[in-house]
């Protein structure tokens, strides 16, 4: 918006004159009342003489002020004093008028100060503020031109939003396509899973909008409640009657027809709780040394043990990855961080060695599948490769997959990327990977530009969760990693994963909009 500086200047000067005129008028009226009360015994001629002397003094003062501004602006016409009556022509008594003239003189100095401020503001402030704002906007614009535009906080915000929306909508179509045969097999309508996924997507979008509007201070205030809710929900997986086991994974709870996977809540809770706890421990490190990190270590250990006890090693690995990023960025001592990584590696190795199924999966990934394993532990991985190979460059067409006809188990869950490659081809599958990279880059760029350590670490944890889990799922499908049972964010069927992933990026959205550079880039 372009302002007319001349009109603004005249308007401010006129406003100053009006305000000063009202102030003087009120002052004269107040003085008139005091004269009327204090001098009730005096004649009316004396009172009128004092009032008229005050009006004359103010009138002369405004004429002097008008002559002062005549060189720069149009002279301002002060209010005309009332014509003196026949009684006002009498000479005034100096002794009586001195006290009355002191108050208008002081008032005139105050009014003149206001008029001077208005004049300076009209002539200088309007142009300087506009020029400084334009310079700031131009500097911000020049900062993000060319290849630097990929770090523009505004572009990153909308890039993340568009990528999440595209993945979520694309996931609805793929869930419907990949689950239709399975639904018919179980005697359910072919669109049953698709409708359920749509409802979860709407619920997740509502959670996204709500989370994006939460002020940053609320996370610090209610972080203990967030962590407690996640820990209690994870503990409910061991309560008889609520516990639900799916394919050996006991990390589910059921409330009637609704099932919930609390581990998804735990991921989001740790993304918020770990940065706050680590930053608080770092501030107390100088006083109590490593004892400051005991509460954080205990809280992380409780959540991790509850997930591992539910036999969900894939989710436990994602949590370990999130914790590793949080501890590294939170300033945890490097020596102890390396020690913790060694301990975590030993624990994972023990969990693998004590499970024959996990050990066979790892060996099949490293050494290939023999004829016996092809019908057992390698069955999913082999048919996933069949699906990817038959898709080619452009795919066989949406809905025309062959592997979804009960050849590839859980085609709409953990192996939905194989159906994407088969039906949509290599190009669309590559575009899906690109969308995850865009989400990760946008969150990473915003995390590096913010001045808040809490926001930076939280954004990095969320990016590690979303992008890391997505890449792990893809690497499992192409047999670069053993089967872990990790869903694909925003795409795989599953209400808990979809809702919590959308809420997580909603939290990231709100934290990204807290960046002051985002306002400057608009």
Provide a role label for each language-model segment.
Residues 206, 224-225, 289-308, 313-353:
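Hydrophobic alpha-helical segments of polytopic membrane proteins
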Residues 447-485, 491:
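Loop-to-helix entry and N-terminal half of a specific, functionally important transmembrane alpha helix
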């Amino acid at each position: 918006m372009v302002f007319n500086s001349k009109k603004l200047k005249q308007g401010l000067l006129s406003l100053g004159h009006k305000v000063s005129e009202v102030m003087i008028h009120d002052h004269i009226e107040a003085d008139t009342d005091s004269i009327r009360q204090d001098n009730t015994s005096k004649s009316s001629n004396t009172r009128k003489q004092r009032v008229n002397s005050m009006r004359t003094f103010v009138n002369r003062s405004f004429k002097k002020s008008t002559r002062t501004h005549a060189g720069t602006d149009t002279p301002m016409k002060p209010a005309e004093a009332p014509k003196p009556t026949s009684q006002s022509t009498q000479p005034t008594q100096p002794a009586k008028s001195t006290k009355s003239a002191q108050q208008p003189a002081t008032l005139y100095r105050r009014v003149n100060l206001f008029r001077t401020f208005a004049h300076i503001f009209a002539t200088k402030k309007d142009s300087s503020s506009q020029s400084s704002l334009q310079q700031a906007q131009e500097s911000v614009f020049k900062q993000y031109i060319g290849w630097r535009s990929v770090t523009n906080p505004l572009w990153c915000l909308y890039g993340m939003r568009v990528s999440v929306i595209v993945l979520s909508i694309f996931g609805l179509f793929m869930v419907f396509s990949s689950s239709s045969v399975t639904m018919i097999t179980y005697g359910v309508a072919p669109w049953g899973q698709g409708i359920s996924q749509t409802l979860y997507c709407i619920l997740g979008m509502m959670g996204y909008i709500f989370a994006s509007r939460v002020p940053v201070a609320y996370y610090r205030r209610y972080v203990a409640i967030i962590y407690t809710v996640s820990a209690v929900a994870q503990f409910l997986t061991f309560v008889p009657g609520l516990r639900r086991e799916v394919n050996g994974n006991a990390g589910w709870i059921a409330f009637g027809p609704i099932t919930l996977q609390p581990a998804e809540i735990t991921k989001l809770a740790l993304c918020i709780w770990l940065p706050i706890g680590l930053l608080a421990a770092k501030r107390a490190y100088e006083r109590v040394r490593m004892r400051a990190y005991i509460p954080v270590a205990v809280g992380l250990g409780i959540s991790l043990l509850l997930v591992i006890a539910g036999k969900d090693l894939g989710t436990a690995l994602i949590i370990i990855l999130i914790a590793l990023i949080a501890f590294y960025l939170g300033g945890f001592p490097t020596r102890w961080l390396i020690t913790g990584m060694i301990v975590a590696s030993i624990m994972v190795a023990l969990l693998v060695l004590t499970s024959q199924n996990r050990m066979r999966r790892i060996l099949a990934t490293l050494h290939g599948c023999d004829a016996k394993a092809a019908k057992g532990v390698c069955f999913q991985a082999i048919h996933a490769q069949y699906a990817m190979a038959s898709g080619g460059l452009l795919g066989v067409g949406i809905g025309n997959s062959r592997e979804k006809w009960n050849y590839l188990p859980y085609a709409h869950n953990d192996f939905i990327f194989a159906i994407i490659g088969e039906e949509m081809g290599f190009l669309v599958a590559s575009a899906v990977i690109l969308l995850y990279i865009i989400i990760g880059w946008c969150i990473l760029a915003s995390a590096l530009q913010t001045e808040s350590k809490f926001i930076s670490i939280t954004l990095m944890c969320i990016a590690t969760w979303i992008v890391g889990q997505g890449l792990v799922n893809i690497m499992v499908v192409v047999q670069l990693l053993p089967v872990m049972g990790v869903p694909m964010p925003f795409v795989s069927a599953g209400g808990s994963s979809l809702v919590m992933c959308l809420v997580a990026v909603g939290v990231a959205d709100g934290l990204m909009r807290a960046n002051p550079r985002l306002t400057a880039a608009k």
